[in-house]
Amino acid sequence: MAENGESSGPPRPSRGPAAAPGAASPPAEPKIIKVTVKTPKEKEEFAVPENSTVQQFKEAISKRFKSQTDQLVLIFAGKILKDQDTLMQHGIHDGLTVHLVIKSQNRPQGQATTQPSTTAGTSTTTTTTTTAAAPAATTSSAPRSSSTPTTTNSSSFGLGSLSSLSNLGLNSPNFTELQNQMQQQLLASPEMMIQIMENPFVQSMLSNPDLMRQLIMANPQMQQLIQRNPEISHLLNNPDIMRQTLEIARNPAMMQEMMRNQDLALSNLESIPGGYNALRRMYTDIQEPMLNAAQEQFGGNPFATVGSSSTSGEGTQPSRTENRDPLPNPWAPPPTTQTAATTTTTTTTSSGSGSGSSSSSTTAGNTMAAANYVASIFSTPGMQSLLQQITENPQLIQNMLSAPYMRSMMQSLSQNPDMAAQMMLSSPLFTSNPQLQEQMRPQLPNFLQQMQNPETIAAMSNPRAMQALMQIQQGLQTLATEAPGLIPSFAPGVGMGVLGTAITPVGPVTPIGPIGPIVPFTPIGPIGPIGPTGPASSPGSTGTGIPPATTVSSSAPTETISPTSESGPNQQFIQQMVQALTGGSPPQPPNPEVRFQQQLEQLNAMGFLNREANLQALIATGGDINAAIERLLGSQPS
C-alpha cells in the first residue's frame, strides 16, 4: 500500500504539467483586433477576432449600418474581400482600415443567391468561439456610435458642406411658424412662386447641377432617405437626370404641362374596365389623407377655391357615391378683381430743372414703374405677414444675423465688392435703370460692413426700433407712389434703404423674386442723407449713416467668425455658392481633377493607385464613387 501510495503520489504532480496544455488551450482564444470600417460619409470601429471570416465580419457590420450582408462590399488594398476568406489571409491586423461600399438592393440579388451556396461549407468549419466573441465586441462600442445619427436629426436644414443650420437658431418654434406661413402664402399665390423661379439668382443656382447636388446631399433628411433607399443616390449622382430635373424646375410652364398630362392620363383610366374602382381607391387612400394633412398644416385645401367658392366640408361626397362632375382645373386663373393701375405717362417738370426734359421724363417713367411694381409686391399679404413676423419676433432676426453662416456670407461679400455689386445689378429692378445702378454701387461696402456691426444687430433686435423703421417704410412708400417727383432718386427702392437692415436678413430665408439684395439709399431731397441705421441724435454722424466711432474695419469680421472656424470648407462652399449666384450665365465647369479631388483621395485610400484610371472612371460616372468603384473593379483582370 505504501508503494502504491508512493507510486500514486508522483503521478498527481505529474498531472499538473500534463494538464497544463489542456488548461492552456481554452485561454488561447483568438486575438481581438480593432478594425476601422470607413464609408464615404462616416467611419466606425469594430473589435473582432483576428481569425474571423469576412462573412462574420459583414454580419457585425450589417447590424451597425442597418443593411443586408449581401449589400456590403469590403475593399482592402484595392481588392474585394470574399466571404469565405479570413481576415488573417488578407493581412488585416489591429489598427488597419477597411473600406465599405453599400450596394443598392435591386442590383446584388443575383449575386446574393449564389454566394451562400459556395460559402456555406467553408464558413461552418470555422471555430465556433468567434461567433460569440464578435457580437460581444461590437455591442461594447455600439453606444459610442449611436450618438452620431441623433445629431443629424436635430435640424432639417442643411446647406453645402455645413453639417446643418442648427447654429442659426432655426429650430425655434417661431421659425417653424414663419416657415409654415411662408409655404401657405406660396401655395395661395402661384405668381409669387413663378417670380421666385424666374429670379436670376435662382436660375443661376438651378443651372449648376453640382451645386444643387451638394445642397441636396448635405440635407440630413436626404442623407437618411438615401441610406434607406440607396437607389436614389444613383439618381442624384447622374448629371443628366439632375440637369433634366433642374430644367423642369426652372420652367414652371413645363412642370404644369407634365402635371396636366399626368391628370389626363389618370382621367382616361375611367374608360378602362376596372379603372374607375382604381381611381376611387386612389382618391380614398391617397388623395384624402394628403388633403387632410395639408388642411391641418396650412389651414385649408389650396385647390378648393379654384373650382368652387364653397367650403372644404360641404363639397365632399361620400366615398361610395359616384362622382359625375368633372374635376376642376387647378391651373385656371382665379377670378380676381384687379384694380386698374393709375399709370400717368405725363410728367411735370420742376421749374428749377430746365435742361434735359426728355431724359427726366424717361427717368420719371422708370421711377413710376419701379415704384408701382415694388409697392405692389410689398402690399401683398405674404410680405405684410412676413414683416409682421419680423417685428413680433426680433429674437429670430438676432439669431439669424449672429449665426456663423450669415456672418461668413457677409464677410465673403464684403471682401469682394465686385461680386456683391454683380449680385445686386443682376436683379431686373436695377438692370433697367443704369442711374440707380451707379448710385447703389459705391454704397455696397458700407452696407455690408454695417450689417456686421454688433450695434446694428442689437438695434434690429429692438421691437420699438423695428416698428419705427416700419413706419418710415410705409411713409416712404406713400411718398414714392403719390409724389414720385419729390424724391426721384429714391422712389425705385420704395424706402427699402431705411428698412434695409430690418429686411435683409430675410433674404436667405425667402427670396422674393426680382427685389434682389436690399441696399441703403442716399439723398431724400431737402431732408438730407439717410443711412441704414445711423442714429439721428449722434453728433458727427456721416452721410452714410455710420458713426465715425463705430466704423467697422476690415479686420473686424474675421475676429467675430473665428470661434466657429468658418475659413475651412464652409467658407469655400459659400464662395462657390456666391459665385454660382452671381454669374449671369452658367459658370464654367472646373478642372476634373479639382472637381473630383475628394473622390480621388477616397479611391487612393481604398487602394486604387492609378490616378488616371480613377479620374476617367469618375468622369464617366459623373462623380459617383460607388459606380466608379464598380467600373474600376470591372476593368481589372480577374
Curated annotation (Swiss-Prot):
The keyword S-adenosyl-L-methionine does not apply. The ubiquitin-like domain is essential for its inhibitory effect on GPCR endocytosis. Mediates its association with the subunits of the proteasome. The UBA domain is essential for its association with microtubule-associated protein 1 light chain 3 (MAP1LC3). Mediates its association with ubiquitinated substrates. One of its GO terms (biological process) is regulation of autophagosome assembly. Residues 505-537 are annotated as: 11 X 3 AA tandem repeats P-X-X. It comes from Mus musculus (Mouse). PANTHER family: UBIQUILIN, UBIQUILIN-2. Plays an important role in the regulation of different protein degradation mechanisms and pathways including ubiquitin-proteasome system (UPS), autophagy and the endoplasmic reticulum-associated protein degradation (ERAD) pathway. Mediates the proteasomal targeting of misfolded or accumulated proteins for degradation by binding (via UBA domain) to their polyubiquitin chains and by interacting (via ubiquitin-like domain) with the subunits of the proteasome. Highly expressed in smooth muscle. Expression in other tissues is very low. This is Ubiquilin-2. The gene is Ubqln2. Residues 589-635 form the UBA domain.
